[in-house]
Design a protein with these regions (language model features):
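Glycine-rich, aromatic-lined ligand/substrate-binding cores of catalytic
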Residues: 217, 222-405, 418-426, 430-439
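N-terminal Rossmann-like dinucleotide-binding module
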Residues: 26-93, 172-175, 269
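C-terminal lid/capping helical subdomain adjacent to the catalytic/cofactor pocket in oxidative enzymes
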Residues: 435-464
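N-terminal Rossmann-like NAD(P) cofactor-binding module of classical short-chain dehydrogenase/reductase
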Residues: 116-117
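Beta-strand-loop-alpha-helix segment that lines the small-molecule cofactor/substrate pocket
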Residues: 121, 126-174, 188, 432
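Short amphipathic alpha-helix with an adjacent loop that forms part of the alpha/beta core around
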Residues: 104-111
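N-terminal secretory signal peptides and thylakoid transit peptides that target proteins
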Residues: 4-27
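Rossmann-like NAD(P)H-binding beta-loop-alpha module
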Residues: 176-225, 229
């Protein structure tokens, strides 16, 4: 394990830092004090370097670490269960102490860090992020925020109680396109919106869905700690179909195409239309791979393709109408709008808004909106900006850790938005049945069998 001298500096510790420590203490029943003493979260002087620990150093986690480092953060500790997968990040940060178990890292580094980034598979997002929050640290977590609805609700509450700065990895939330989408819709450029279509071409060729559990049990690679990779999920033999990338298509580890891309796509209608929680959701799925030879639902992997229909009540005291939002994945898409001409086509991943005066569509990650018919653009050009522009997705969180300005996509927003995504994922457990959703009590009221999947039991040694 690489060793470096402790780089935490007493620096500047404001009254706000002491307040956050007290708030976290009250919320979680233990004492937190500033980093230079034991390691509570707080806000730094502009001149003080942010000290960060990274949980998940390969793949997206490695990309997050590289970007946040360029902003000026100092990664003093890195944790990954796969040395080969994380080798590039380890090499770029030779002085960072290395760990395999994030629980050990947080225990040993609590006095040295201000913040934690989490870039692991979906099934360990919650346990890693919650551990960091309970340690009083600011948290950046990749999308989707959690693997289950229960985890999402609990993590959102914990972040609020602790007063830490949080952000989820839906990069397009900071884009110019996302702000124009909000401003044009709210200015009435396409009129009243009651119908939305959102889609993704995933899983496609990127990972497999609609398949059964592999029967082969090859040896675990020497560089991988399979037990820690599983984390809180029930034990099963290693197979390369799961790690490092294919986990997205398996119920135990991922959230399917909807969970993987929904936070990049559904984010924008949820935000622009102020949708709030759905009142119901219903899925239809492909039969190929969805049913096993006993005519039972495939409990191992997600269907190859699905359509999920959400219903939302009217909002803002009746000023905003009810909305039906339909999600498509696995290559399924909504019909091409009649207003499209020539070689115009919908993007492979995106959103289509159907208004009373026209239509609007954009690509994933907050792509620039396009209007149908095109003549509506002249009206859109007259819409004055009403929203603050973002300095950048990662910059928002990085600056928040220093100045306490809450990021637009903090867990207070991204938590409920992720719940909407995960409710759609839940509906895949009961295709063809409309699930009535009680968001206050986090349960389906008319199909109680699916409530068992709102949270899954952790194996011994793991807790939220």
């Amino acid at each position: 394990m690489t060793e470096i001298s402790k780089s935490a500096s007493p620096g500047f510790h404001s009254t706000r830092r002491r307040f956050v420590s007290s708030a976290a203490s009250a919320a979680f029943g233990f004492t937190l004090v500033p980093r230079h003493v034991l390691g509570g979260a707080g806000y730094l002087a502009p001149s003080e370097q942010l000290q960060v620990a990274g949980i998940g150093a390969g793949g997206m986690g490695g990309g997050d670490i590289a970007t946040i480092s360029k902003l000026g953060a100092n990664y003093v500790a890195l944790c990954d269960v796969d040395d080969e997968r994380a080798a590039g990040t380890f090499g770029a940060h030779p002085k960072a102490r290395r760990y395999r178990d994030f629980r050990e890292m947080l225990d040993k580094e609590v006095a040295n860090i201000d913040a934690v980034t989490v870039g692991t598979p979906d099934h360990t997002h919650a346990v890693a992020s919650m551990a960091a929050i309970k340690a009083g640290k600011h948290v950046y977590c990749q999308k989707p925020l959690t693997h289950t609805l229960y985890e999402c609700r609990e993590l959102t509450k914990a972040a609020k109680a602790a007063g830490v700065m949080t952000s989820m990895g839906n990069q397009g939330h900071a884009s110019e396109g996302s702000r124009l989408t909000n401003e044009w819709i709210q200015a009435g450029v396409i009129g009243e919106v009651r119908e939305v279509h959102a889609w993704s071409d995933r899983a496609g060729k990127l990972w497999k869905q609609g398949i059964g559990r592999p029967s082969e049990t090859p040896a675990v690679p020497a560089t991988l700690d399979w037990n820690l990779w599983l984390g809180p999920i029930r034990e099963r033999p290693y197979n390369p179909a799961y790690a490092p990338f294919g986990w997205r298509g398996w119920w135990d580890f991922g959230t399917g195409a909807l969970g993987d891309m929904g936070c990049h796509i559904i984010d924008h209608p949820v935000w622009a239309l102020k949708l709030g929680a759905p009142t119901s959701v219903e899925a239809s799925t492909t039969h190929d791979g969805t049913l096993n030879d006993k005519n039972e639902l495939n409990s191992e992997s997600f269907p190859k393709a699905a359509i999920v229909t959400y219903q939302f009540h009217e909002r803002d005291g009746g000023k905003l109408p009810p909305v039906t939002m339909t999600w498509y994945d696995g290559g399924l898409m909504p019909p091409t709008p009649a207003e499209m001409t020539g070689d115009q086509r919908l993007p492979d991943n995106g959103v289509l808004y159907v208004g009373s005066k026209g239509k609007m569509f954009h690509s994933s990650h907050g792509g620039m909106p396009q209007l149908l018919p095109g003549e509506l653009l002249e009206q859109a050009k007259t819409v004055a900006p009403t929203m603050e522009r973002s300095p950048g997705h990662y910059e928002e969180w990085f600056q928040a850790c220093k100045n306490g300005k809450v990021p637009v996509d903090s867990f207070a927003y991204s938590g409920p938005m992720t719940e909407t995504v995960l409710l759609g994922v839940l509906s895949l457990r009961a295709p063809g049945r409309r699930l009535l959703w009680d968001t206050a009590n986090l349960k389906v009221t008319n199909v109680p069998d699916v409530n068992q999947y709102i949270h899954t039991e952790y194996r011994k040694g793991w807790s939220l």
